[in-house]
């Protein structure tokens, strides 16, 4: 950094401090703000709480300041709610008032300033959801593609059985499951699949998506997002984000979207039964409902929101079953008893397997893939729990704490699927109880629930019925340390799993 830039930065900090103090005094008189740590000029609470705003750190703050508290992160107001009642207020009762998405310097790059579905501005949300519902999020889609999901899950089983290391020293099962998830979603999107983990296009796609996730999920860029005058220090980071974004969108366009357009020009896709998701999306584009960029950013959403989050949940489910052998045995016994030994789990079978469903619910409770949901924002001044919420505040719902608060749940730290068959038998993943919101609820809920639950059931069901899933030799358990990100909760270390095939003779 040269001397001139340093002088300009220090001057800007002094001016910003003066303005911040003045605004703070004026606003303090006008607003009744939620409690929280005392902020300092310019930096707010950033120096006190740091960049790492993961679900556990925010839970610790909730224990100090209450179910609603305010953090001043530089020039941004960050309001965190941590009770079912307040979650209902934000997501349902005042769903319109708090229905917008906050801006973020990195996500502005990766979503084209909200040209996707997840971060689209509230006014266009309903139209974008309508366009995406038909090709992705209906029971018709489940029935159309469930045979493909079952095929991909069985391919994992077959490949693991062929690998001699799987039943001895063990394998990193996640790698093969990642290919499965790409194939499941690329079948729906493009009617395409990858033959192996070594497929050059899959390798390239996986690497770019992985780099995108690393850049977007990191807390490293928060300081430049919260304090705009520090943004020059992010120049290299944001340049890398833009390069990754451009390369990904070009790859989506060249290898998938344009290829499907060419196919459509030579082969009729008017038959609804032959259409894949991109055909429906391109139809909407031709009608002028969305533009070329929207098409690519929708594809970008599915590559991250659908593939990664479901993969994280599958990986967490396997880890918990490996570490809780009695629970794994109960799942296996239920499948054998209800379906018969060797009868492979299918999508229609899932309704007959309540204990397997309880395992999935418990995985999503204890290891919620999006523990803070996706942030909300109020465009205008609003009221919440008797407090004033200034316009354009970032609202976080700590959904992980809602589902892990001992005041709300019996021994929440335990992995105990039985709770969903006993005292919590009424609780579903669709948001019927505001203590349990793995997919959110309301206007901004995740529509992918209709795909994620059956994919989780088929995958975990087939793995458990075909293998004994064990820790590697010399270990009694596998490491389940967490890694939290801006919007994610995944396992820190991708563990080696021993998969001993079962005999059905």
Swiss-Prot record:
BP GO annotations: lignin metabolic process
Sequence similarity: Belongs to the cytochrome P450 family.
The protein's annotated pathway: Phenylpropanoid metabolism; trans-4-coumarate biosynthesis; trans-4-coumarate from trans-cinnamate: step 1/1
Protein name, per record: Trans-cinnamate 4-monooxygenase
Subcellular location(s) of the protein: Membrane
EC number annotated for this UniProt entry: 1.14.14.91
Keywords attached to this entry: Heme, Iron, Membrane, Metal-binding, Monooxygenase, Oxidoreductase, Transmembrane, Transmembrane helix
Record-annotated membrane-spanning stretches: 3-23
UniProt binding sites for heme: 446
UniProt cofactor(s): heme
SUPFAM superfamilies named in the record: Cytochrome P450
Reported induction: By elicitation.
Chief place of localization: membrane
Pfam families: p450
Binding sites annotated in the UniProt record for (E)-cinnamate: 212-217, 305
Function: Catalyzes the first oxidative step of the phenylpropanoid pathway in higher plants by transforming trans-cinnamate into p-coumarate. The compounds formed by this pathway are essential components for lignification, pollination, and defense against ultraviolet light, predators and pathogens.
Classification of source organism: Eukaryota, Viridiplantae, Streptophyta, Embryophyta, Tracheophyta
Molecular function as annotated in GO: heme binding; iron ion binding; trans-cinnamate 4-monooxygenase activity
Reaction catalysis annotation: (E)-cinnamate + reduced [NADPH--hemoprotein reductase] + O2 = (E)-4-coumarate + oxidized [NADPH--hemoprotein reductase] + H2O + H(+)
EC category: oxidoreductase
Topology of the protein relative to the lipid bilayer: Single-pass membrane protein
UniProt cross-references to PROSITE patterns, sorted A to Z: CYTOCHROME_P450
């Amino acid at each position: 950094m040269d001397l001139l830039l340093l002088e300009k930065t220090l001057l800007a900090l002094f001016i910003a401090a003066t303005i911040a103090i003045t605004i703070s005094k004026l606003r303090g008189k006008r607003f009744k703000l939620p409690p929280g740590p005392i902020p300092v000029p310019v930096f707010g609470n950033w120096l006190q709480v740091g960049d790492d705003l993961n679900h556990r750190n925010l839970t610790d703050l909730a224990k100090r300041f209450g179910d609603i508290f305010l953090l001043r992160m530089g020039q941004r107001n960050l309001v965190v709610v941590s009770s079912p009642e307040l979650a209902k207020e934000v997501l349902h009762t005042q769903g319109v008032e708090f229905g917008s998405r906050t801006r973020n310097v990195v996500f502005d790059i990766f979503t084209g300033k909200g040209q996707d579905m997840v971060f689209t501005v509230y006014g266009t949300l309903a139209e974008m959801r309508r366009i995406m519902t038909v090709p992705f999020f209906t029971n018709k889609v489940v029935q159309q593609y469930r045979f493909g999901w079952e095929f991909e899950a069985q391919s994992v089983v077959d490949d693991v059985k062929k690998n001699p290391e799987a039943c001895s020293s063990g394998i990193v099962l996640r790698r093969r499951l990642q290919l499965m998830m790409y194939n499941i979603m690329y079948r729906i999107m493009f009617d395409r699949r990858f033959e192996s983990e070594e497929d050059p296009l899959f390798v390239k796609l996986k690497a770019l998506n992985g780099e995108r996730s690393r850049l977007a999920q990191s807390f490293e860029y928060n300081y430049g997002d919260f304090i705009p005058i520090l943004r020059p220090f992010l120049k290299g980071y944001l340049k890398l984000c833009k390069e990754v974004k451009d390369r990904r969108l070009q790859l989506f366009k060249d290898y998938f979207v344009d290829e499907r357009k060419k196919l459509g020009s030579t082969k009729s896709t008017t038959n609804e039964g032959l259409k894949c998701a991109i055909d429906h999306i391109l139809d909407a584009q031709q009608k002028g409902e969305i533009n070329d960029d929207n098409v690519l950013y929708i594809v970008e959403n599915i590559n991250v929101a659908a593939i990664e989050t479901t993969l994280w949940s599958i990986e967490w489910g396997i880890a918990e079953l490996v570490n809780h052998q009695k629970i794994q045995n109960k799942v296996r016994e239920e499948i054998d008893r209800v379906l018969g030994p060797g009868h492979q789990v299918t999508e229609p079978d899932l309704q007959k397997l309540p204990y397997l469903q309880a395992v999935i619910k418990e995985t999503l409770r204890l290891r919620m893939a999006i523990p803070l949901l996706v942030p909300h924002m109020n465009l205008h001044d609003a009221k919440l729990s008797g407090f004033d919420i200034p316009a354009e505040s970032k609202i976080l719902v700590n959904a992980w704490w809602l589902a892990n608060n001992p005041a709300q749940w019996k021994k929440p730290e335990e992995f105990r699927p039985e709770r969903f068959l006993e005292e919590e038998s009424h609780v579903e993943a669709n948001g019927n109880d505001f203590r349990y919101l793995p997919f959110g609820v309301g206007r901004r809920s995740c529509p992918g629930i209709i795909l994620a639950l059956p994919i989780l059931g088929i995958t975990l069901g087939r793995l458990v019925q075909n293998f004994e899933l064990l820790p590697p030799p010399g270990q009694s358990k596998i490491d389940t340390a967490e890694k939290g990100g801006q919007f994610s909760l995944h396992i820190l270390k991708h563990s080696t799993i021993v998969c001993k095939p079962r005999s059905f003779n």
